[in-house]
A protein has these predicted regions:
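Short amphipathic alpha-helical heptad-repeat segments
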Residues: 43-46, 108-112
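Amphipathic alpha-helical repeat scaffolds of TPR domains
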Residues: 2-15, 36-62, 88-103, 126-141
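Canonical positions in the second alpha-helix
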Residues: 32-33, 82-83, 117-118
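Short coil/linker segments at helix-helix boundaries
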Residues: 51-82, 102-103, 110-111
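Residues in the short coil linking paired helices within alpha-helical repeat scaffolds
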Residues: 22, 72, 106-107, 141
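Primarily a tetratricopeptide repeat
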Residues: 28, 71-74, 78, 113, ...
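Solenoid-repeat scaffolds in large eukaryotic assemblies
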Residues: 26, 59, 111, 128, ...
Length: 148
């Protein structure tokens, strides 16, 4: 079992790797810990790493090609689902779920629900405000396409 100091050190290291776009390293480090010992926060961080790897790739190798690895992004969502009970009223969980749903399903409807809940939890968060606006724009575009 990891103690609090070890977990804090790992979380700090994960943030460094995340900033350097080293998502695979984050995944390997977290998955080296037995699943039943990971807890809520490490599970959410693991989901973030899978989501970022799916969309961006290590060191931005996907760049802006718009290619998303469907298996990885669905795994990211499964990880978030596994801690839904603890996450439902956590702004960060809703943020990760909103972004992941938007990338996985190319549909803003499910992402919009998480984005709105995130914004309700932290109304002043500019990132939450932006995700809500982005989802609203996507939903308008989807509606316009249906009308064509």
């Amino acid at each position: 079992m990891m103690n609090q100091a070890e977990e804090a050190k790992l979380l700090e290291q994960l943030e460094q790797w995340n900033k350097k776009d080293e998502y695979s390293r984050c995944i390997r480090a977290i998955e080296a810990i037995p699943e039943q010992e990971r807890g809520y926060l490490l599970t959410v961080k693991l989901s973030r790493a899978y989501s970022n790897l799916a969309v961006l790739g290590d060191h931005g190798e996907h760049g802006t090609d718009g290619e998303v690895d469907g298996d990885l992004i669905r795994h990211a969502i499964e990880l978030l689902e596994s801690v839904r009970a603890q996450g439902e009223n956590d702004p960060y969980w809703n943020a990760r779920m909103g972004y992941s749903c938007l990338m996985a399903y190319r549909s803003a409807a499910s992402a919009y629900e998480y984005a709105k809940h995130w914004l309700a939890l932290v109304p002043d968060d500019p990132a939450a405000q932006k995700l809500v606006r982005d989802c609203e724009e996507y939903l308008e575009e989807e509606k316009a396409l249906e009308l064509d």
